[in-house]
Amino acid sequence: MKILFNNTFELFCLFVFVTWALFLNNNGILYPVHCLKSAGDTYVDTLRGSNFNNEFIDLLSTRDICNTIKNYITREQIKCAISYDVLNISNIINSLEKTLLRDHNIIINGKEDILKKYLNTFLTLYIKRQSEDVNNFIKKFSNSKLDVVINYRYYEEKFLSEYEEIDSLKKGFSNHISEIKDILNNISSSNNYKKKSGVIYFPDVKETLYSKIQILKEILCKLRNKVSFMYNINFALDEFKENFDKQVYNFKGKEGLNDFVRITSDITNPTSTFTNVVDINKFNVNTQMDEIQNGTLSKEHLNDFRRNIINLDVHIRDPSSFCVNQVENPTEMNINNPCNNNDGNNINCKDLVEEDAMLNHFSFLLHHLEKMTCILIFSLKNKISSARDDIQKDINKMESELINVSNEINRLDIVVDVPQHHILNYHNKNENKVFNLMNIKNEYYEYLGGHNKINNNFDDFDNTLMLLERKTNWIKDQNIMTYGDREDIHEAISSTLEMIDKLKDMYVTENFNLLITYENLYKEINLFLYNKQYNISEEAYIYAWNSLENFKGKKLLTEGIDRLLGSVMSISYVIKYVKVANKHLNPQICFNLNKLSNAFMNIEEKLVLYRNQFYRLNHDITTLKLFKNNIEKLGYAYRDNMNKVHINMDTYNIATENLQHEIDNILENISDVLYEDMLINELKTMRATWKNFVYVKYDYFKQNNKLIEEFDENKLIIFPPQFGLMKQSEQTNIRNDNNNNNNNNNNNSNNNNNNNNNNKDNSVASLGSSILTRTSSPDNYLIGQNFIKSPYYNLLYEFATEKINCAKTPEERIKSFGEIYRTIDRVSSVIKENRKNLRSKYDNMRIEILKLIDYRKHTFEETKDVHKELIRLEGFILNTLDNLFAKRMTLSVQMKNSVEMLKGSLYKDKLPDYCKAVEMFIPKYFLTMTRWRNFLLEYRKIMPSRVISKFYST
C-alpha cells in the first residue's frame, strides 16, 4: 500500500512539474493578448505565435495601438491590391513607427526601445500574413459582374494612356506651331519673286504652311475629343461607384454581415484598453476557455462570459469621410462577443466563436475595402477633372496661337498678286472657282451692252447650228491648196464666224437663264430650311423644282455646245492647215487669214470656258429628284433638331432664372447665419464686460439703495458704459459719484483702521475709475455695437430691466443686479435657435440648388448633343447643295445661318458672374460657414450688396 502511494505521489509531482514548465515557457499563457479574443485573427496569431518580449506584447495589446496598426496596414494593402501602387513594407514600417511614437506617446512612455526592437520583426510577419487574407477577401468579394481590381485598374490605365497621348499631341502642336512661326519670320516682305539665296518667299512655302495648319486643326480636334473622353471616364466612374455600392450591399446580405453589424453597433460604452476588458474577480480565463474548447458551456456561464469579455470600444465616425452610411471598423465593436443566448441549457460555443470571428474579420475587411475604394475613385476623379481643366486651358491657348498664325498666312496670301477671275473673263481657265451670282449678273449685263437684245428661239438655234455644220463640212471637203485662188472659201469661213457668234450669244443667254432658275430654287430651299412655317407643299417651292427639271434649254446647253465646239475646232484646224500648206500667199490674203484665225481661237476659248463653268449644272431628272429627296429628308431632320435646340435653351434659361433666384436666397440665408455668428461672438465679449462691470459697481449700488434710486431715473445704468448706451455726461456723473463714494470710504477706513475694507474699496474704486475713464473716451472703445443695432437688443433690454423690476425688495434687486449679465445667455439661446432654423433652411436650399445645377447641366449637355447632330446634318445639307449647284454658287445663307455662327448668341449663359462663382463652389464637399465667409470675401467685388447686406455691413 505504501509503495503504491509513493508511486502515485511521484507521478503527481512529475505531472505538476511538467505543467509548471509548460506555463513558464508559454508566453501566450503567461501574457495573454487581450486585444482580440476572436479565433483566427491574424494580428493576435502573429503576436502570440512569436517569441516577443512580454512588455512588447502588452504594449501592442493596447486597443489604440492595435487599431492604429491594423487599420493603417489594411488600408495600405487594399489600396495596393486595387491600384497599381507597390506595397513598400519598409516605408509602411517607418511610417507606423513614427505615427505610434507621435500619437501614442503617453501609452509608449518609457518603452520606446522595446517598441523599436521588436516592431520591425512583428510588422514584417503581420504584413505578410495579412496580405494573404486581404487578397483572398478581395477575390471572394469580386464576382463575374463586378471585379473591383479589374474595373478600377481599367479606368486608371485608360486615364494614364489618354494622358500620355495628350502629352504627345501637345508636343506635336508645339513643334508644328514653332516651325510655322520660324517660316513666317523668315518670309521676305518683297513682292519680287525672283529667287535669292537665303530668302523664303510665300508662294514657295504656301502649300507647306496650309498643310501644317490642317495638321494643327486635326490635333486640336483630337484634344477636344480627349476632353470629352475624360468627361465620359468620370461618368463611368460614377456608374462604377454605384455598382460597387450595390455589390457591397449584396455581399453583406450574402455573408450575414448586415444583422451582425446592426446588433454589434448597439454597444456604445467604451473602455480605454484591451487589457482592462476582463474582470479577474468575476471571470476565470483558463476555466472558461477550457469549457469553450470542450464545446459546451452552460447558459448562465455563457451570459457571464459575454458580459465580462465583450469589447465595448466603438469609434465615432468621422463626418469628413468620403463614403457615408458605412459602419466604422466593425472589429472595434463587440469583438469578443462569441455567443448569443439560446433556448437550450448547453450551447456549442466553439462554433459560435469561430462564426463571430469570421463575421468580425469579414466586416473589418469589407469596411476598409469600401472606404479605400471610395477614396481611390474620388482621387482618380479629381485627377481626371484637374487634367481635363488643364487640357481645356491649353486648348484655348492653342486656338489663340492657331488663329494668329492663320491670320498672318491669310494676310500674306491676299497681298500676293494673283489674277482675279470672273465668269466672263475669256482667259479664265480655273474651272473650280466658285463665283458669286451677283457678279455673274453684272458681268452678263455688261456683255449685253454691245449687243441687241437676244431672244432665244430653240428652232432657230437648231437650224443655224445645222447650217453651220453643213458649211463646216463643205469647207473641210475643199482643196485647201487652192485657197489663194478661191474667194468662196474665204467667204464661207467668214459667214460661219457670224453664225458662231450668234450661236454663242444664244448659249450665254441660256446659261444665264439656268442660273436664274437655280437662284429661285435656292431661295425656296432656304425658306424651307430656316422658316418653321414653310412647307414643301408651297406652290413656289414646287414650281422652282419643276422649272429646273423641265428646263427647255438643257439640250442646247449640253448637246448644242458640243456640236458648236466641234464646228469651231474643225474650222480652226482648217485655217491652221491653210497657213501651213500655202507658204506664198498674197500679203492681204495672209492678213485676212490671220484675222480669221485669231477670231476663231478667241471664240473657242470663250466656249470652252462657258462649257467648263456650266456644263455640270445640267443634271438629269433622276439626279434632280435624288437631290430633292435628300434635301427634304435632311431639311426636316435639321428643322426638328433646331426646334429641339430652341426648346432646350428656353428650358435652360428658365432653369437659369430659377437658379439665380435660389442662389440669391441662399446667399441671403448665409449672410443671416454669418450675422448671427457674429452676434454670438459679440455677446461673449459683452457678457465678460458686463460681468466685470457688475463686480465693480455691486458695492456702490448696494449702499443706501442707490440701485433703486438711479434705476428708476435711468434704467440704462445697469448696462456697462462700454455698450455706449448712455451719454458721456451721464457716464461722467456716475464716475464722479463713484469717486466721491470711494473717497468717503477711504476716510472712514482710515479713522476706523479697517485695513481689509480699505484695500477692497481702493481696488474697486481704481478699477471702476479706470473702466469709466476708458469707456467715456472716443467710440473706438465701444463693444457690441453691431448687437446694439440689431433687433435682439430690445430683447436684451427687456430681459435685463424685467429682471430688476420683478425684484420686490432691495435685497432681491441688488441680488438680481449681481446676476444681470446672465440675461445675455437667454438672448444668446434665442439667437442660436434662430441660427439653427436658418441652417436648416440652408441645407434645404443647397439641395434644391444642386438639383437645379444638375438639371441645367443635363439640359445643356443634351443641347450639345443636339448641336452635334445639327452640325452633322448641316454638313450633309451643304454637301448636297454643293453637288446640286456644282459648286458654282456661294452658299451665303448657309454660312449666315450656320449653327456654328449662331452658337455664341444661342448658347449664351445668362447667369451672372456671382451666380457662376456660387455654382462652382456649392457642390464642394464639407462646406462650412467659415468657408462660405472666405468665399464671400474673395468674391466681394462681384457679389450684390442687396443680397448679403448684413454680412458686408459688419
From Swiss-Prot:
Keywords, alphabetical: Coiled coil, Merozoite, Signal
Compositionally biased tracts (Low complexity): 736-763
GO cellular component: host cell
Biotechnology: Possible candidate for an effective malaria vaccine as determined by epitope response in sera.
Coiled-coil regions listed in the entry: 381-415
Region called Disordered, residue ranges: 733-765
Position of the signal peptide: 1-35
Name under which the protein is recorded: Uncharacterized protein PF3D7_1404800
